Amino acid sequence: MALHRDDICDRIRTLALPVIDSMNLELVEVEYKRSGREAVLRLFIDKEGGVTLDDCADLSRELSTLLDVEDLIPCEYSLEVSSPGLDRPLKSEADYERFSGRLIKVRTYEPYQDDAGNRRKTFLGRLEGLKDGSVVMSLTEGQTASIPLERIAKAQLEFEF
């Protein structure tokens, strides 16, 4: 029985986390994409101070061996390990606390109202942190927004010049 993409990502996450933790790294995201006979498995990692090329190479070697033994991916694939980049996604409550004070972009599933009464799906502003399960932001237009986590489709850091 073929596994669904989300199931593969969940199994990879479960398999990879002990290795990642032992290397004092943080797993940001697992991405699996298949196109025809080709597939790509991407793991995005981070650590305080940023990841190095050696971190990525070391983890790639460790995981390659483990993935070959476990045989979770039903076809040939390429394994890519990298940093999440300057526009790092925010996935966990800890991310919202860690990156408090940074400029972020948030997209909601449906239009949501900011504190000035404007309804929209995209918010750009300074992350103030979490309060009662909501992401609190000072928006670039001067308003504020408090967006419940369950309404957020995507959130990411924004590069500042």
UniProtKB/Swiss-Prot annotation:
Q: Name one GO biological process term.
A: translation
Give the record's keywords alphabetically.
Cytoplasm, Ribosome biogenesis
Annotated S-S bridges? none
Alphabetized InterPro entries for the sequence: Ribosome_maturation_RimP, RimP_C, RimP_C_sf, RimP_N, RimP_N_sf
From what superkingdom does this record's organism come? Bacteria
> According to its UniProt record, where is this protein located?
Cytoplasm
Kindly indicate whether the keyword Cytoplasm belongs to this entry: yes
Q: What's any one GO cellular component for it?
A: cytosol
UniProt xrefs under HAMAP family: RimP
Give the family, as the similarity comment puts it.
Answer: Belongs to the RimP family.
Provide the function of this protein.
Required for maturation of 30S ribosomal subunits.
Write the protein's name.
Ribosome maturation factor RimP
